[in-house]
Swiss-Prot record:
SUPFAM superfamilies reported for this sequence: OMPA-like
Entry protein name: Uncharacterized protein HI_1457
Gene Ontology, cellular component aspect: cell outer membrane
Repeat in keyword set: no
Provenance organism: Haemophilus influenzae (strain ATCC 51907 / DSM 11121 / KW20 / Rd)
Disulphide-bridged cysteine pairs: none
GO MF terms held by the record: porin activity
Short name of any one Pfam family annotated for the protein: Opacity
Length: 178
């Protein structure tokens, strides 16, 4: 029994020597598109904070919180709509280990929340709603290793936030490994 415990502990230490926890912060721009609604053409400022675990040199998982910012739109030139989007996601990554440059691809599943405000243009009517939907996304990017524990990150991503809401974004940030 003691030998099994010692072997298990050594195996755990060997795994943890290769694996790393990390925290990553990203800033960028997002273009949210709402089907059948004339949304503004200007991108919104997006922020993301992630906590992840690198299982080995190729596979990692991350949990993230993303703030998509505020988007304004109008429907049939009668109603002005304002949407503030937030998301909590789980992303699986595959890293292509090419020395200091590491291209990667990922798939993201998320729960997305939106605070929606609608105002009628010609009447004094205002409505508020909060909606939550499940979404899926894909991303690709590259990380450049600055030091053993710090990497510069850039990526492009597509997220289907709801059946009629999608997002295309570009982000850059820093990853700190422990």
């Amino acid at each position: 029994m003691k030998k099994l415990l010692i072997v298990t502990m050594l195996f755990t230490l060997a795994l943890s020597a290769q694996a790393q926890w990390y925290v990553q912060g990203d800033l960028g721009a997002s273009k949210i598109d709402i089907t059948h609604v004339n949304s503004s053409n200007s991108p919104s400022f997006t922020q993301r904070i992630s906590v992840g675990y690198a299982f080995d040199k190729n596979f990692r998982l991350a949990v993230d919180y993303t703030n998509y910012g505020k988007v304004t739109a109008n429907y049939a030139d009668v109603v002005d709509v304002s949407l503030k989007g937030k998301s909590l996601g789980l992303t699986g990554f595959y890293d292509f280990d090419l020395a200091d440059f590491k291209p990667y691809v990922g798939v993201r599943v998320s729960t997305n929340g939106a605070d929606v405000t609608a105002n009628a243009r010609y009447y004094r009517i205002e409505a508020f709603a909060t909606e939550t939907r499940i979404g899926i996304g894909a991303l690709a990017g590259v990380q450049y290793k600055l030091t053993d524990n710090v990497a510069l990150n850039t990526n492009i991503e597509y997220n289907r936030l709801a059946s009629n809401v999608s997002d295309v974004g570009v982000k850059a940030g820093l990853r700190f490994s422990f």
